[in-house]
Structure formats: C-alpha cells, structure tokens
Amino acid sequence: MVSASREIAASSDLIFELIADPAQQPRWDGNDNLASAPAGQRIRRVGDVFTMTLTKGSIRENHVVEFEEGRLIAWTPAEPGQAPPGHLWRWELEPAGTSRTRVTHTYDWTRLTDENRLPRARATTADRLRASLDRLAALAEEPSLPG
C-alpha cells in the first residue's frame, strides 16, 4: 500500500467534483494511465460503476466501494464483466481552513489476488500519487474555477 497527501488551496467540494466525475480524471492522473471516460458518470454512492479507457486502449469497470459526498471516494478496478482482483484507489478530503483542503490519495494492493498484476502494483509509488495530487491542485487552484 502506498499513499501521499498534500494541502490544496481550494474547497473540498470543488476538489471532490474533479475526482467524482470520471471524465475529469485523465486531466489529473499522475500515472499517465487514463485516456478517457464517457461523460455523465458522476459518482454518487457505493455500488456505482464507472468505465474508463486506459492509455493502452483497454477498458476498466471501476466499482465504487466507499463513498461519502465531499469527503471520501474509493473504487476497485476490474476488466469488463469480471470481479475486481482486489486493488483499490482511495481519495480522502479533509477541510483545512477557509478554502483549503488536505487531500490523501491511497493505492492499496494488499488484497490483490492476480499475481500478474503485482509487479505493476508495486511500481506505483508515492511519487506517482503525488503527481496526481499536484495535477489535481493545479486544476482546482485555477482562478477561472469557482470554489
């Protein structure tokens, strides 16, 4: 398991919208793994499933397993029609004063059952998670965005 945190000069509501809308995720993905996601998949609850096209062209179904509006979201990716193999992406947001938010991004592969995925899972470093946080911060802190 690996995680990274940083403070972002934006409201938790604004940051959460960038995370909870899968169509926005390729804009801030620090792993350079996400190519696109169809619009209209805004995550609203545990049990939601959203699809994403990866940069290598494959499709992933992401199963939302944790959700608290404005504060917490986590999903487990899977190949279409398959059970998730056990790795999880989590985002936690905590207000840190007026229009500031502490954001923690975690990748947890401790329950990963597919041995073939372990090398790539272990290659996901805190630096890559920080890259996502930095890109997310750059978008959220843009003066043109409300929040």
Residue ranges and their predicted role:
Residues 1-41:
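Hydrophobic ligand-binding cavity/cleft-lining segments
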Residues 3-5, 49-51, 74, 90-92, ...:
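Beta-strand secondary-structure signal
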Residues 6, 60-66, 77, 87-95:
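Hydrophobic/aromatic beta-strand elements that line small-molecule binding cavities or substrate pockets
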Residues 12-13, 65-70, 92-102:
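A short, structured loop/turn motif at beta-sheet edges
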Residues 36-82, 102, 138-147:
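Glycine-rich portal/gate segments that line the openings of hydrophobic small-molecule binding cavities
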Residues 79-131, 147:
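Beta-strand/loop substructures that line and gate deep hydrophobic ligand-binding cavities in soluble
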